[in-house]
Amino acid sequence: MADLRSTFLNVYSVLKSELLHDPAFEFSPDSRQWLDRMLDYNVPGGKLNRGLSVIDSYRLLKDGHELNDDEIFLASALGWCIEWLQAYFLVLDDIMDNSHTRRGQPCWFRVPKVGMIAANDGVLLRNHIPRILKKHFRGKPYYADLLDLFNEVEFQTASGQMIDLITTLEGEKDLSKYTLSLHRRIVQYKTAYYSFYLPVACALLMVGENLDNHIDVKNILVDMGTYFQVQDDYLDCFGAPETIGKIGTDIEDFKCSWLVVKALELSNDEQKKVLYDNYGKPDPANVAKVKALYDELNLQGVFTEYESKSYEKLVTSIEAHPSKAVQALLKSFLGKIYKRQK
């Protein structure tokens, strides 16, 4: 796996070099240096799970056959396209959320001399994806499907982000809107499609499959993405900041988090009043009251039960799939996220 990771990182260097010498634009030394630094700061710094899972998925769909160098390169290039998409979302997301840290370092727009140039950097990151696809996939029979896939998933993610942002609008904060179905909608569109479905869809296209024949796989992956986001919501409050690489602010930010939805479900009127009075306020005293209520309601125990039930349900869905290769792929995904701490 360490070897796969280093191979994957080598492909990043190749793609970055191609983008820094893209013939469609005449770079000056300053602009090339800016882009070089911007890419290194934002693209390769995460866990790389989404990108690496394209290679894993492709290998499993080929029944575990060893991939040749060309196949590894192409699967890696698609994996990096997803990492580029992720970088684009995060750079802009951090501006919108006025965040401070990301992956254990200051958000890009917080770096001296960057500021709002980060907005254009986000647009550039998004535009690098079709450049990479054109250079390496233009002759492939699935090229148009790849372009369609990335466009559709980006649309779904941006639309999920919209629901997330408008539910947290200043002056329109209304906890009574926060339900499990709203939470699921935000998660499905904002996270599940690009984090879970997209890597597998890329691998399916590479092995010549038609995505319309794999709606069941998409549904299982969206369920997995929902489970992943519930873990994220849980870790935002109960995870160790040094482990997760960021300081959680869901309570201050009035996020439609799984925790607040469950708290609303389980609270009596008095406890609901504590939530209504304190949720979405930046003062640490208000945040502490919400966290104390979460403890009072034993949300850690409620989460543990949710985690085991979700796991069982996902395993049952996966084992109902007719293809052993697809089962292996989905189980490997689930194995990576079950009981994760970061």
Curated annotation (Swiss-Prot):
Species classification: Eukaryota, Viridiplantae, Streptophyta, Embryophyta, Tracheophyta
Enzyme class: transferase
PROSITE patterns found in the cross-reference section: POLYPRENYL_SYNTHASE_1 (PS00723), POLYPRENYL_SYNTHASE_2 (PS00444)
Gene Ontology annotations of biological process type: cholesterol biosynthetic process; farnesyl diphosphate biosynthetic process; geranyl diphosphate biosynthetic process
Amino acids binding dimethylallyl diphosphate: R102, K190, T191, Q229, K246, K255
GO cellular component terms listed in the entry, alphabetical order: cytoplasm
Name of protein: Farnesyl pyrophosphate synthase 1
SUPFAM superfamilies in alphabetical order: Terpenoid synthases
Annotated Mg(2+) 1 binding sites: D93, D97
Enzyme Commission number: 2.5.1.10, 2.5.1.1
Job of this protein: Catalyzes the sequential condensation of isopentenyl pyrophosphate with the allylic pyrophosphates, dimethylallyl pyrophosphate, and then with the resultant geranylpyrophosphate to the ultimate product farnesyl pyrophosphate.
Highest taxon listed in the record's lineage: Eukaryota
InterPro entries membership: FPS1-like, Isoprenoid_synthase_dom_sf, Polyprenyl_synt, Polyprenyl_synt_CS
Major location (coarse): cytoplasm
Cofactor note: Binds 2 Mg(2+) ions per subunit.
Recorded family membership: Belongs to the FPP/GGPP synthase family.
The keyword Magnesium appears for this protein: yes
Cofactor(s) this protein requires: Mg(2+)
Keywords noted in UniProt: Cholesterol biosynthesis, Cholesterol metabolism, Cytoplasm, Isoprene biosynthesis, Lipid biosynthesis, Lipid metabolism, Magnesium, Metal-binding, Steroid biosynthesis, Steroid metabolism, Sterol biosynthesis, Sterol metabolism, Transferase
Residues that hold isopentenyl diphosphate according to the record: K47, R50, Q86, R103
Name of the encoding gene: FPS1
Catalysed reactions, semicolon-separated: isopentenyl diphosphate + dimethylallyl diphosphate = (2E)-geranyl diphosphate + diphosphate; isopentenyl diphosphate + (2E)-geranyl diphosphate = (2E,6E)-farnesyl diphosphate + diphosphate
Compartments (UniProt record): Cytoplasm
Transmembrane regions: none
GO MF, one annotated term: metal ion binding
Pathway terms, separated by semicolons: Isoprenoid biosynthesis; farnesyl diphosphate biosynthesis; farnesyl diphosphate from geranyl diphosphate and isopentenyl diphosphate: step 1/1; Isoprenoid biosynthesis; geranyl diphosphate biosynthesis; geranyl diphosphate from dimethylallyl diphosphate and isopentenyl diphosphate: step 1/1
Organism: Lupinus albus
